[in-house]
């Protein structure tokens, strides 16, 4: 089992990385499994479908400050440390593109979404445009639906579940990450 992500965050960290919360970390970890376990707490690098970049753990492109090679391996502790660094970086990048105040649930959902699709896709997606323009709940659900319903080549059902969890978290007013609730999304919209 990988290390717990619940670390004490200072007030300075909360201000510096507003989207990086325990909730966002939990949301990503709940739906992302570290890939290519070698056993005994070691993990190997891998390539995602259609990519030329090597990754490790939760999708990190680097380990210990350098880009990965095909022969790289890492321990649980190294993967966890790099995952936290990646999320801090993503938090800063997401903060640059979101111009409206958001609840902690919404921040968590957006960080998970951006981490999954990549910052280049996130900054140009229509969903971000709707969020920044204070669009209605129905408009957001309608825009999130293709991300839920699309057949993901490398993610399959796990990716569909992750997108639903992100939407549920984004729409949830509570402090807990909600369990899945069905939305009126057409299954084969795209």
Regions found by a protein language model. Give the residues of each.
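Long, amphipathic alpha-helical surface segments
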Residues: 2-16, 23-26, 30-43, 80-84, ...
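Extracellular/periplasmic catalytic domains that process cell-envelope and extracellular macromolecules
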Residues: 19-20, 47-50, 102-106
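Residue-level detector of buried hydrophobic side-chain packing
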Residues: 28, 56, 110-111, 166
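Active-site-proximal beta-strand/loop segments in catalytic clefts of secreted hydrolases
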Residues: 31-32, 58-59, 113-115
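Substrate-binding/active-site groove segments that recognize
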Residues: 45-71
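Alpha-helical segment that forms one wall of the substrate-binding/catalytic cleft
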Residues: 66-99, 104-122, 133
């Amino acid at each position: 089992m990988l290390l717990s992500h619940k670390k004490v965050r200072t007030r300075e960290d909360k201000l510096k990385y507003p989207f990086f919360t325990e909730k966002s970390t939990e949301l990503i970890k709940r739906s992302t499994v570290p890939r290519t376990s070698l056993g005994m707490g070691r993990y190997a690098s891998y390539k995602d479908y259609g990519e030329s970049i090597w990754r490790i753990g939760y999708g990190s492109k680097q380990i210990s400050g350098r880009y990965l090679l095909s022969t790289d391996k890492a321990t649980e502790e190294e993967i966890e440390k790099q995952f936290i660094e990646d999320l801090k970086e993503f938090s800063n990048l997401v903060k640059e593109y979101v111009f409206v105040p958001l609840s902690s649930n919404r921040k968590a959902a957006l960080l998970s979404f951006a981490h999954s699709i990549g910052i280049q896709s996130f900054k140009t997606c229509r969903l971000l445009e709707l969020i920044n323009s204070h669009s209605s709940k129905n408009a957001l659900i309608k825009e999130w639906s293709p991300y839920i319903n699309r057949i993901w080549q490398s993610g399959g059902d796990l990716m569909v579940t992750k997108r639903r969890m992100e939407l549920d978290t984004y729409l949830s007013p509570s402090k807990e990450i909600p369990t899945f609730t069905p939305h009126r999304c057409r299954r084969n919209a795209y």
